[in-house]
């Protein structure tokens, strides 16, 4: 499995600049609405220093980090669900995303127009949330007559109708399904066929002035706008500059802004955490590689991420923790120290497990 994050935001908030920095891919980043007409898709690797060390230990030719896909989606405006701007054409582009990342403008620059004429992070967040909620309302409202008709023929559909009716009420109250479904007792799995947008977790990137990156009082105000969701703060222009610099110059620039690492790295990790994902590792002469699995995945399920045959014919998993392996200095030394163990089908994977699966098909 891989993580896909849909990047949404009002026009001119720095969304495409952020995407360019993420993927080192120069999509059109222009100071006018809808510079992004079709979604740009980029795949980047989850930053993971462990892979470099594994490659050293195993003499790996290649390093393959866990992939993260970012989809840069055309700017939406107030009324998009009713056809304003580019209308709801953007909706189809984010239905397949695992999570929605809202890029919110929190910087002041008179040379960069704001679509609503003023910079207000709270208003921008409300606009985007409202458009996504309205889009889901339309989807549920359109589907309900069909679902009710099906329920008359198939009794098992009654639960789906009840879930859809409860979801409609929640959305009509201005609450996203991700936030409100649990407390309302709505089983979102029953509504999977509707591909509702607000069932996805949201995370937020605040594009702030470089001078505000160390202003904790200001950042706390922004965090409060989206709590309990995760917030990441960065200056998209700085992030764009960082990718053009060598390691020493990049570190100097980061330190000058009070940061220890690029905001992009934090964003990718927050995406993993928000979705409850983790990585396990494999290594050999050909490659050192990270694989993405949900927290709580069993060893056979993790094996299936590599190939379905691995899961179907799973026998055992030879596992050592990354820290134990590095401390030992080699796999043979880790085995001699009793740090390598054989695990069966009920084993729950841990982040940083270094694994070799044994299977028979």
PLM regions: where:
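Conserved G1/Walker A P-loop phosphate-binding module
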Residues: 1-111, 122, 141-142
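Conserved Switch II/interswitch segment of TRAFAC-class P-loop GTPases
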Residues: 42-47, 74-84, 95-157, 170-184, ...
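Amphipathic alpha-helical transducer elements in NTP-driven molecular machines
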Residues: 34, 48-51, 64-70, 84-98, ...
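Glycine-rich, flexible loop/turn motifs
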Residues: 25-33, 40-42, 50-53, 111, ...
């Amino acid at each position: 499995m891989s993580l896909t994050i849909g990047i949404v935001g009002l026009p001119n908030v720095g969304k495409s600049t952020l995407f360019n920095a993420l993927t080192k891919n120069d999509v059109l980043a222009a100071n006018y609405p809808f510079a992004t007409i079709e979604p740009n898709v980029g795949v980047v690797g989850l930053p993971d220093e462990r892979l470099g060390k594994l490659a050293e230990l195993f003499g790996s030719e290649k390093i393959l980090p866990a992939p993260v896909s970012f989809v840069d989606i055309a700017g939406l405006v107030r009324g998009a669900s009713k056809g304003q701007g580019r209308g709801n054409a953007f909706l189809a582009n984010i239905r397949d995303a695992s999570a929605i990342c809202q890029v919110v403008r929190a910087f002041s620059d008179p040379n960069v127009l704001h679509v609503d004429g003023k910079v207000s992070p709270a208003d921008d967040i409300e606009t985007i949330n409202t458009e996504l909620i309205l889009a889901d309302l339309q989807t549920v409202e359109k589907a309900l007559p069909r679902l009710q008709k099906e329920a008359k023929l198939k009794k098992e559909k009654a639960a789906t109708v009840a879930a859809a009716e409860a979801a409609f009420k929640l959305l009509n109250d201005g609450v996203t399904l991700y936030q409100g479904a649990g407390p309302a007792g709505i089983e979102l799995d029953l509504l999977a066929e509707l591909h509702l947008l607000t069932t996805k977790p949201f995370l937020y990137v605040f594009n702030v002035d470089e001078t505000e990156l160390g202003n904790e009082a200001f950042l706390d105000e922004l965090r409060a706008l989206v709590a309990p969701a995760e917030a990441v703060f960065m200056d998209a222009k700085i992030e764009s500059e960082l990718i053009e610099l060598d390691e020493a110059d990049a570190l100097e620039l980061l330190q000058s802004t009070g940061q220890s690492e690029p905001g992009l790295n934090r964003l990718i990790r927050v995406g993993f955490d928000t979705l409850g994902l983790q990585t396990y590792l494999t290594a050999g002469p050909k490659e050192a590689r990270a694989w993405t699995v949900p927290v709580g995945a069993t060893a056979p399920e993790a094996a299936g991420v590599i190939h379905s045959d691995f899961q179907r014919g799973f026998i055992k998993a030879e596992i050592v923790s990354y820290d134990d392996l590095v401390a030992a200095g080699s796999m043979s030394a880790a085995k001699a120290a009793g740090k390598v163990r054989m695990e069966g089908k009920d084993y729950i994977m841990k982040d940083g497990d270094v694994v070799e699966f044994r299977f028979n098909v």
